[in-house]
Amino acid sequence: MKLGRDIPIYKLIIIKNESIENNLKEISFSDNFKCQICEGLLISSLIPNRMKALQCINGHCFCLTCWESILEIKSECPTCRIQIQSMNTLSNNLFIIKSISESIKIHCPNYLNFDNSNNFNGCKEIITIDEIDRHESKCEFRFIKCSINNQCNEIIRFNERDKHESQCDFIIQKCTHCDESVQMKQMQGHILFECLKVLITCQHCSLQFTRLKLQNHIENHCKEIKIECPFKSLKIIYNNNNNDNDNNDSDENNSNQSLSSSSLSSSIIPLSPCNELMKRSELSKHFIRNHQYHNELVSIVLKKQENKIKKLETIIQQNNVNQNFEISIIKHSNSLTRDSFYKENKKKDKLIQDLMKRVLILEHQQQQNQIQNQIQNQIQKLSNKSIFTTTTTTTSTSDKNNNNNNNNNNNNNNNNEDEEDDDNIKNNDNQGNLKSLREMFNTISNFKDDENEQQQIQQQQQLPFTSFGPLSVQQQNNPTKQFNQLSQPQTQPQSQSQSQSLFGEWSPITINQNQNTPSNPFSIFSGTSL
């Protein structure tokens, strides 16, 4: 499809003979504007980038179309045979282009219709080539695309756009029935098949309903449509043994039969469903006419349902009994497992208590042995120190007296007095330490007597005993509490307040009888003056 400037220029040149398409030689213009190959105008197109008159370097000028066809065959000028590598090596003859644009008159490119067949409703303006740009921007016959929708590819003239916009297939319109927005070309199908508010005539009763309500009318309300009896779905065989079977032969008897109440007492009574077809308007008459038969069907259905309900109730009761029995078994097994678990835990607790008691006794005995060893070491150190000081003082005084006899009597007397004072101070310190040790051992011996008495009492009562006294029943049952009480510092009675010595505050101990200790703890100081 060629529009406007796409049309070849020879179709727009004004000539007297209108058969120009059949004979191009009848076009009258100067030979200077004529192509020597095709004998047409040197400007073959009105498109800006193709409106050229190209020539070689020797000035041989041809139209653009001829140059393209020549270079496809051979890369040389057909006149001078000069080599031409490409179209870019050719030059544009601006003088010829200007002369043709000012002198040659043509029809407006919108003169012809878009199919180039005729000039119906075309532009009648006659212009020169250089006036095309100015005229084409204002021409009422120029070709444009539809601006309503991008899907519309129709090309129309500018002066016909209003008419096309009112008839375009892609214009959006509202349905007159449901106000839904629909394209023009789809409106007819929307009204015939989709619109829910369009009125449609019922085929049975000739009444009009909207498409939205028509289906409901046909299924539930139309009085002229034929329907089945509602009792057709009842397919039952009733007998005295209450055996429920499905009756597959639904078309054996006509629904107009009526069964008397005496017939129910027979052994086996086949009841076929009601298969009659009738108009909905005649349904009430059908119910009145066959009400006895329908009632018998309903009574049989009710009896059947009652039997099913009874069976279900018995099944539920049996399930409840079984469930209760299972629950009782589970509870009993749980109680047995719980009792066995408690017994095992009791045994474990008892073992733990025994172990804790043994650990506490061993720890306490170890502490007593450590304290006893420390006291004996300190006593040994003090005894050795006192013996050493007495021997050194005697030797030092004798040596000093001999030396002082050789010196002046006054100086010797003063030195002897000072040395005697020092010896007296040291002896007083040793005597004080020995007194404190004597008091300490007295308290230890007293505590030992008390402990022996407690051991005798414990043996009589058969209770566990520690150096802190007999354990109570609560302490035996709770070894953790016993351990906490023993680990805490004990408050000593007033009778044992004198058991503090140079080593600080300590808990009373019992001296192991198996150790080789002297009966008199101060026998190690024999030979020394206390």
Swiss-Prot record:
Keywords: Coiled coil, Cytoplasm, Metal-binding, Repeat, Zinc, Zinc-finger
Residue ranges of the region described as Disordered: 242-267, 391-432, 483-530
Compartments where located: Cytoplasm
PROSITE patterns: ZF_RING_2 (PS50089), ZF_TRAF (PS50145)
InterPro entries (UniProt xref): Znf_RING, Znf_RING/FYVE/PHD, Znf_TRAF
Composition bias, Polar residues: 509-530
Record's keyword annotation contains Repeat: yes
Zinc finger (TRAF-type) stretch: 134-188, 189-246
Stretches of the chain forming a coiled coil according to its record: 361-422
Biased composition range(s): Low complexity: 253-267, 391-415, 485-502
Annotated disulfide bonds: none
Zinc finger (RING-type): 35-81
UniProt GO MF annotations: zinc ion binding
GO cellular component: cytoplasm
Main location: cytoplasm
Domain text: The MATH/TRAF domain binds to receptor cytoplasmic domains.
Described purpose of this protein according to its UniProt entry: Probable adapter protein and signal transducer that links members of the tumor necrosis factor receptor family to different signaling pathways by association with the receptor cytoplasmic domain and kinases.
Family the entry assigns: Belongs to the TNF receptor-associated factor family.
Name of the protein this chain belongs to: TNF receptor-associated factor family protein DDB_G0272829
Species annotation: Dictyostelium discoideum (Social amoeba)
